[in-house]
Amino acid sequence: MSVLTKIKKKLRSGTWYPLYNTLYEKESVDSKMILLESRSGRGLESNIFALVKELNRPLYRDYTIVISYAKGFRDAVEKKLEQYGLKAGRIVQVGSLSYYRCLSRAGILINDSTFPGRFIKKDGQVYLNVWHGTPLKCMGRDNTEERYSMGNVMRNLLMSDYLLFPNAFMEEKMSGAYMLPELYQGEILHECYPRNEIFLHPEAGIRMKETLGVKEKELFVYMPTFRGKADAVDKNDSVEEIRGYLKRLDGLLKEKQILLVKLHPFVGNALSFSDYSHILPFPDKYDTYEVLNACDALITDYSSVMYDYANTGRKIILFAYDLEEYMGSRGVYEDIRTYPFPLVRTPEEVAKLLQTPSRPLEKGFLKKYCTYEHVGGTEKLCRQVVLKEEVCEVHRLSSNGKENVLLYAGNFDRNGITMAFCNLLKQIDQDKYNFFISYRGNSLKEAPWHLDVLEGDVRVYPIASEMNLDVLTAFAQAVYFKTGLRGMGIGKRLNQAYKREWKKHFGNSRFCHVIHYNGYENYMLSLIERCPFPRTVWVHNDMVRETETKKNPNRYVLRDTYGVCDHVAAVSTDITKSIVEISNREDNILVIPNCIDEEYIKNRAEQKISFDEETIANVSLEELQEILGNGDKKFISIGRFSGEKRHDRLIEAFNRYWKENTDTWLIIIGGVGNLYEETCKIASDCEAADHIILIRSMANPMPVLKKCDFFILTSDYEGLGIVLIEAAVLGVPMIATDVPGPHCLMTACGGTLVAPSADGVYEGMKAWENGKVKTISVDCEKNNRTSVELFMELLGGF
């Protein structure tokens, strides 16, 4: 393989991606270059095709048109251009070096979906998003299954200078799903969908019928929604159902009736049309909407094409044979049974309706779903965006007048930080600010259900992609992590990189305050350090000790982030010393105790004991319930399986105690952490092995805690030890090692502290046995009042 071939292979494979930062920084914006992308390059269709036709007019001869295509779609794009006599200055493959060069240069960007996660809009670029359809299915935050992955759509919409909304319904639903009124800084264009303008020219439909050779026939089209998964087409029951329905319908159509069938690309090839007399595949040679305009009726189910086709005033039949199943499995904005279209369940009913005259469409439906459709809209759209002429109806979204606060919460692992964050959300007055909860989508990909802890109508702002890391920045960051050095251009390069990252994720969105509540993650800490708004980072632990055992967070990252933040909020007085040791600054430190939801703790404790899908334990659920119900004494500890929790110390002390009291059990429940297997080994090697229960990942351990007699915290260090408060609320006596965090709480509440050693923990067990360990009392109401007051003062809004 030649050197040139190797280079070409690397460029095609995407290993050149780090060069995008160079292209972004070095390429000048060309105001005469227009990059258009349709559905991530999977063809040249819909609104983008209509815009390409308009941009081929002589009026735009000075502009270079660039069209992107996905791998495997180049021929389709080129044939489409040739078929219609259209020209493009160049076509580029999505993800290629040429693609990202054009993405960095083009003065005008037009997309009907999203650009990739690494894309950053440059100053001087104009971005028009013509989203690909009016939504019936719930989107964005309205779809709980989509909340973790909606980040790239959201940021693409927010960075757009223009959003095209062809109807009032779409504007309402898209705005709510992606929280546009509070964040969007661009303009809304109330104009027609370019693809729909063809429907306002019925004579073009007649010509298309002639072209297709069906001038004397009735032409219908069936366009159902795709069901199932893209990787399981052959096994998808709905494909078999459609095949059977089409066979029945084919036998019912008249001699001069033809049905075109356009299925989703994932299933289109799964059907053979050779056995049908009146049914043909949809002709791919022509634009979809030009063929639609030639059809006398549309048969669909839940597809947004119904809203577009309504512009023709022709018959629409909803063939929803699986209505209840579909509506039950997918969130939808409206019940299609209320629409002014006949809804049927069988092919026989479809055939009968095709023989009946159509009725005029209700004006109310057209007003709601075809609000801004009119002749000449495509031309006006191009004049507005490309030629900078003020010809479109422009609208700006109205916000609620409240300032925005961004709260980065991490990945919602089952731990004290997540619990404290959720408690804070419940306690604060969310009517005073627009609170946006942020998290990294990729970190939730394997466990999207972690977001279920977010209750109610919360605003979210997911981070869509990882860092755009180039070689020099990676080297600078490695040196910085190792030495803390910021000279020799290292600090400058990192500042440039993370400011670029902020722009990638948040664009022009404005916040009155940005809070890194999680307090971990080098990437997010570095991002917050370069945040252009007032910022606060929360501290939940002794970070000196954390950085001694963990690489993330890095000590130098904490030093510089703590040093520049407006506030560093510690959850207890005990850990402020470690903050000062890291940052050498104490004037920006606040102590804000964690909020406590007393009723929530009690209510959870009353729930049935259950394991989750991801729970791992050395006993079955039935065995656990039996043990909790016997008359033996049960000790419990709750905390992640990581080194600082010192479960080894606890097991050693318990083993010693058990040899004197064999009617005793130890239950350890932990969440994240990499020491579960090691802890199991330690437990199995001691005499009390059969009386030690280890449970990893349990969404609700409170019912177990309530049934236990004694709670033990054996950590080397903690931020606060919120589980101590949970035990106190449930009336469970406890001891804790005398370390920062628990020391402050237990001293204030008259609790029992023991030496941080196996001997100390054993002595604590004996003290409990002798009735010398009591439950502690925490004034939750007073604590929460203080916490909320301090939090609101931090924002400047108390």
Regions found by a protein language model. Name each.
Residues 169, 194, 574, 595:
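Carbohydrate-associated surface elements
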Residues 46-50, 230-247, 416-423, 633-656, ...:
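A conserved mid-protein helix/loop that constitutes part of the nucleotide-sugar donor-binding site
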Residues 298-299, 315-326, 724, 733-736:
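Short hydrophobic beta-strand element within catalytic cores of glycosyltransferases
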Residues 716:
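Aromatic "clamp/platform" in nucleotide-sugar-dependent glycosyltransferases that forms part
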Residues 31-37, 215-231, 402-410, 613-645, ...:
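Conserved donor-binding/catalytic core segment of Leloir-type glycosyltransferases
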Residues 84-85, 267-284, 458-462, 679-697:
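Nucleotide-activated donor-binding/catalytic signature segment of Leloir-type glycosyltransferases, i.e.
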Residues 67-71, 258-267, 438-445, 596, ...:
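Glycosyltransferase donor-sugar binding loop
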Residues 342-346, 748-759, 766-772:
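Conserved acidic donor-binding segment of nucleotide-sugar-dependent glycosyltransferases
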